[in-house]
A protein has these predicted regions:
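Histidine/cysteine-enriched polar flanking segments
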Residues: 4-367
Length: 367
């Protein structure tokens, strides 16, 4: 593999560990790290968190959050290569303490000037070789030659990106299977949930359920307006067609609800700027076991709670956004192997900072 390649995103592969940094998200960030460690440690996967003082592995119970200049989205800044090197976006104020990383993992670190953020591409196994899936918007801010130089001899396949980065919209698994957010599937699931809630309410006249129905209808109107304004359905349809044309197995899932903002991100189209995510189950960590089964770790959304979808009500009407996401993966990932991590505080922080679990962690492959 070429030393010129800087990539952070993988399809589902066996992991040795995942690495993140204390980017100033507070105590609840460590709670998310601890939950993730509890899940992945059972699979033989370690979770590393870098603080301003040291790197801690797996046990975060006694940590007191401290201020740091660390950039929180490690996925976009740091890459653990299969050729046993680490590459960083640059030795900037947000990328201090790289020496600690080098010593912890006994790997050399290399600075990359011509950097492409890891959230906008994935390496995918295709016929035993790695190819690159790259968000097409990179072509608007980088020259094709610089992109090819960046990825070396590897084939680069550009894809339409409905969102700021590809890892916010798709999640590659293994065997060329790719989860793709599907707004139409989400809307169908929401409609069915509203229908069942109305049927139960007609029998029970439960005031809590009445409030849930009202909130679900409001959310539906909000999603429809957003889909129309930003042409969401056509964007995802185009992406799915591109993947199918290139012989990927597209698995549609109801994994994302966006609330586009009005800000501007340098070098990015306006429609993708300052996006907020009411729910994002796409931006996830996936570990492949020896038997090829998968463990899926996504960030928990506060949306179900905000809608009043308690476990009891969700069971009664057979609907919540976590439930319909799990159901969409029947026969692909076992329900007990799909996890949603984080508390209300960190979920809101991630939602308001335009990222989620995959953005937080850099994956360390088994060498």
């Amino acid at each position: 593999m070429s030393n010129n390649i800087s990539f952070n995103g993988y399809d589902a592969r066996p992991l040795k560990g995942i690495f993140t940094r204390d980017g100033g998200f507070g105590k609840s960030f460590y709670g998310l790290a601890a939950q993730t460690a509890e899940i992945l440690n059972k699979e033989g996967v370690d979770v590393f968190v870098q603080t301003p003082k040291k790197i801690i592995k797996n046990d975060f119970s006694d940590i007191k959050p401290n201020f740091s200049n660390f950039w929180p989205w490690v996925q976009d800044r740091l890459a653990f290569f299969p050729n046993k090197t680490i590459e960083s976006k640059g030795f900037t104020r947000e990328d201090t303490n790289l020496k600690d990383i080098k010593e912890m993992f006994s790997l050399p670190i290399k600075e990359i000037g011509n950097h492409i953020e890891g959230g906008n591409y994935f390496f995918i196994k295709d016929g035993g070789k790695d190819i690159v899936l790259l968000g097409k918007e990179e072509l608007s801010i980088k020259k094709p030659k610089s992109i090819q130089d960046f990825f070396g001899k590897h084939k680069v396949m550009t894809l339409s990106q409905p969102d700021f980065h590809l890892d916010l919209s798709i999640r590659p698994l293994n065997n060329k299977r790719i989860l793709v957010n599907d707004p139409k599937m989400l809307m169908n699931g929401l409609d069915n949930g509203i229908k069942r809630a109305k049927e139960v309410y007609a029998k029970e006249k439960d005031s809590q359920l009445e409030a849930v129905i009202r909130k679900l209808n409001y959310l539906k109107d909000e999603i429809l307006e957003s889909n129309q304004e930003y042409d969401t359905l056509n964007k995802y349809k185009t992406l799915q067609q591109e993947l199918k044309y290139n012989k990927f197995n597209v698995i549609k899932v109801p994994g994302l609800i966006i609330k586009p903002g009005n800000g501007v991100v340098a070098g990015q189209p306006l429609f993708m700027a300052d996006t907020k995510y009411k729910m994002n189950f796409m931006n996830a960590i996936v570990h492949e076991r020896a038997d090829k089964s998968l463990v899926y770790v996504a960030g928990k959304s506060v949306l179900d709670e905000q809608l009043g979808l308690t476990p009891e009500i969700a069971e009664k009407i057979d609907f919540s956004f976590e439930r319909i996401f799990k159901k969409s993966l029947n026969g692909i990932i076992a329900p007990d192997d799909i996890h949603f991590v984080g508390d209300k505080t960190i979920s809101n922080i991630l939602k308001n900072n335009d990222g989620n679990v995959h953005c937080l962690f850099a994956e360390i492959p088994k060498y």
